[in-house]
């Protein structure tokens, strides 16, 4: 459950380390984002010589949340941290690598490129 002002880790090699959610996309009254949703983020911490720099405003896909997600078979999946992957306007990842596991719920939201780059799909 990601809302405005939530800090997230960045799970790719785009150069950003921490981002903050500044908007949840998908309707004017939408308050929360979950896994696979697109949010607008501000880069709060970045490494030198990265593809992005501190202060940039970008779009991102939420790939991990600390709030548990119920699956249709009754199982529950949750992660230790909130994490996102930065994307461009064509919904393609900016980075070339994804760090950490991602859930298979991303497949239903048509984020196939993130699924293919991820080292593990849960």
From Swiss-Prot:
Biological process, per Gene Ontology: translation
PROSITE patterns noted in UniProt: RIBOSOMAL_L14
Recorded coiled-coil stretches: none
Classification via Gene3D superfamilies: Ribosomal protein L14
UniProt keywords, alphabetically: Ribonucleoprotein, Ribosomal protein, RNA-binding, rRNA-binding
InterPro entries reported in the protein's UniProt record: Ribosomal_uL14, Ribosomal_uL14_bac-type, Ribosomal_uL14_CS, Ribosomal_uL14_sf
Hydrolase keyword on record: no
Gene Ontology CC: cytosolic large ribosomal subunit
Pfam families tied to this protein: Ribosomal_L14
GO molecular function annotations of the record: large ribosomal subunit rRNA binding; structural constituent of ribosome
Subunit structure: Part of the 50S ribosomal subunit. Forms a cluster with proteins L3 and L19. In the 70S ribosome, L14 and L19 interact and together make contacts with the 16S rRNA in bridges B5 and B8.
NCBIfam families hit by this protein: rplN_bact
Family (UniProt): Belongs to the universal ribosomal protein uL14 family.
General function of this protein: Binds to 23S rRNA. Forms part of two intersubunit bridges in the 70S ribosome.
Protein name: Large ribosomal subunit protein uL14
Lineage of the species this protein comes from: Bacteria, Pseudomonadati, Pseudomonadota, Alphaproteobacteria, Hyphomicrobiales
